[in-house]
Each structure stands twice: as C-alpha cells, then as structure tokens.
Amino acid sequence: NMNRRNISPQAVRICGLTLLCLAIMFGVAAANKAKGGEKLVSEYTVQDDVLPRHVKFESMPADMPQMTAAWFYKYKGLGQFDMCSRLFPQDQLEALNFEQEDRDFKDGYYIQEYIVHGFKTLSQEEYEDQKARYDQLAASYGYKEYKVVRVSFSQKWSPKALQKAPQWGDGEFTRDFAVGREAGLREKWKIFELGMM
C-alpha cells in the first residue's frame, strides 16, 4: 500500500537534531548581536576626494576594555561621531561635544589618519597617582570594575586642519582610557575618563 508514508524514527531524529542546531545557531547569533554585532578589522580606508579617512591597527585589542578604546579610534577616525557618543556615560557627552567635531569634520577640519601601534592595560602601580580619582568616578557610575588602557598611536590631520595649527599636531602620542564595566548581564564597558595626550 503506497498511501501509508512510513516516517522512520531515524528521520524524526535527524529532523529534531536539525531544528536543535538551528535553535543553537540563532541563539549564538542573537547573543553576538546583543554584544554589538560589529567586528573590528585591522584596517579601514575611506577613499573620498573631499574627506579621505584611514584607520589602521598594527596590534589588535586583547579584551573588552582594550576593544572599547579601539572603537574610539575607529569611530573618530572614520568620522562616525554619533557612534563615539555611545562609548561614554551620558553626562559627559556635552563636554565632549561630538556634534562640534562632526561639524568640523564636514568642513574638512579633522584627523584623517590614525595608526594605532598598541594597547597596554596598566597595573595599579602604573596609574597610582590617578587611582583615587578613578575609584571615585567608577563608584559614582556604579561600575563593577574598571581598567586603565594606554594606547600608543600616530595621527595625521587634514591639510585644512593643519593650516589652523592644532594644539596637538601630527605625530606619535599615548593616551590613557579609564574604562568601566556597567552592572548587568551583558558585558558593556564605557570610557569614563579620557586622559590627556
């Protein structure tokens, strides 16, 4: 009798496993998306006649605090100032004034190249002189923990910006980022203190 379709137990098992695999895949994808879903690559180039941009990481971040500092260079270097503001606590945005940087960028006054040479997470001894201040700030934001990441980098201004002789010109610099981990299940870090160059 051809009408009775025999579905073997094996077929049911295979079907069940396939669904399980799909569920796991979607779960992993959702978790990655929750993390931000964006992957950092070692080089970004925007070939634009008016506003060319270049960001290169000679060394890649090793963990989330270093990654947070890396996003700062990526977003700033590509002129994505709306993304920069996501890296900082809400109450610091006015002082950081990314809207002004965005306007300057569109007018051609901007840093057109960042080469990030390396990341170093400092030991407590290395930021001893700032520790009391960092502790107080981190506590005021309710962070679970914080790290201090030192970034060494080179920057190159646009020709138009150089005519205005910026305070920190072209060259090689280091900058410290105090990065705090927000309370909650998702591992989210914010830059709560942007060090002097």
Regions found by a protein language model. Name each.
Residues N1-Y44:
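Gram-positive cell-envelope targeting signals
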Residues G27, A69-A70, V116, V149:
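Generic hydrophobic, helix-prone segments enriched in Leu/Val/Ile
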Residues L20, A70-G77, S85, P89:
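Generic solvent-exposed, charged/amphipathic alpha-helical segments
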Residues M2-N3, M64, R150, E182:
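Intrinsically disordered, low-complexity regions enriched in Ser/Pro/Gly/Gln/His and often acidic
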Residues A30-L78:
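Short, low-complexity N-terminal intrinsically disordered segments enriched in polar/charged residues
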